[in-house]
Amino acid sequence: KNIWLEQLLESQLLFEAWAHEACFIPIEDYALHRSYSNVRRHWGIHGARRVWEQHRPHMEALLEHVRHKGAVKSSDFERKDGEKGGGWWGWKDEKRWLEAWFALGELMIARRDNFSRVYDLAERVYPPARNYTQHPVEEVHQIFIARAVKALGIAQARWINDYFRTTPKVKQSELYPLLDEGTLIEVRVEGWNQPALLHRDHLPLARKAAREQLNASHATLLSPFDPLVWDRERARVMFDFDYRIECYTPEAKRKYGY
């Protein structure tokens, strides 16, 4: 339920940031994601840097406003008569600037009021943000690789980077340390022409699966954006399941409609 996410956000157990896309992330991972944000090539962060370069004086003034006046919502700023918003959603300038500061880490989402984001200084929302530990990019990569494989259950190397949208593609040399220490295990999957990767925490489950001792207990309806199926190539290989979100498909190629 949305209310659960909002409660966890306001309780500072989660925070919002650009990861795979706009995500809720456990607060204990704040330093990891902030450390990686400086090299992340995600469009949300790249766009925020461009907005800052184009509107730096206005953005600095807005940041000072938040610093002295406190948390704000975009609705606190009135659109001037006849003014049209910019960008894809027709946002007013202040909304674009708030979102840019959020993507760049200066602002965080303190809570949501009726789905509207409430922005405040990062150090007021989460005090450790002022002096978080800067992790080397290589260390963050190793952590993200291990967590991605664990989340995916079983994975081919080419699927790993999409989980946290890390770049570039995972190299074999990055897998060796995790394989050597036993965090990841190479396994064979019938019908695959390359080794698969399994997190060691899933080894007991994999052994049960190999003995055909796992039984489905229930069915559920998934969003097309669910991590289980958002990688279409993985869904095809894993489940022989192919789909296309038709709102993103040219009209002439749609089967079912928008």
Where do the PLM segments sit?
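Long, charged, low-complexity, helical-prone intrinsically disordered regions
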Residues: 1-258
